[in-house]
């Protein structure tokens, strides 16, 4: 059964997906095309007037493992700077800096069957790297999604749009 969620909603995967052992969390996005054509036109480009400081929008997926509903230790955060949880049950598959390409741009693989018992929740979050410094926000991306897939059957469990 696939569930569609909106921002901030929660889903209990074990409730509706009996036997779910390993999930893939996939994050995808595309940079929105600037309205009005973008870089200032032909002459701006020709004479150096086009924007040259543009930085790609870098969305990042992270998994936070909670004990009794609380974040206790920074090693329980799995992200581009800590690709593997100490238990080996949560693995970030690498950082995509641009969102280019089709399908998942970043993935986190979670082996639910091996998560140590002291962890009661895993929270998935998405942020834009250095968003304030780069003056970027989520309205600057399009076609964004987070999907949870059963790694064994490749069946979608949840989709967040």
Predicted features and spans:
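Intrinsic-disorder/low-complexity signal
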Residues: 1-161
């Amino acid at each position: 059964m696939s569930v569609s969620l909106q921002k901030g909603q929660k889903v209990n995967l074990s409730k509706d997906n009996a036997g779910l052992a390993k999930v893939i969390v996939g994050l995808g996005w595309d940079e929105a095309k600037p309205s009005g054509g973008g870089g200032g036109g032909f002459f701006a480009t020709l004479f150096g007037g086009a924007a040259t400081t543009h930085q790609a929008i870098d969305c990042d997926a992270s998994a936070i493992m909670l004990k009794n509903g609380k974040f206790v230790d920074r090693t329980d955060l799995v992200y581009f700077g800590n690709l593997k949880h100490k238990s080996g049950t949560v693995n970030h598959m690498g950082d995509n800096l641009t969102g280019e390409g089709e399908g998942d741009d970043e993935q986190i693989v979670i082996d639910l069957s091996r998560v140590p018992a002291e962890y009661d929740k895993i929270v998935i979050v998405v942020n834009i790297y250095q968003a304030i410094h780069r003056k970027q926000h989520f309205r600057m991306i399009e076609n964004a999604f987070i999907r949870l897939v059963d790694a064994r059957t490749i069946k979608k469990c949840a989709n967040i749009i």
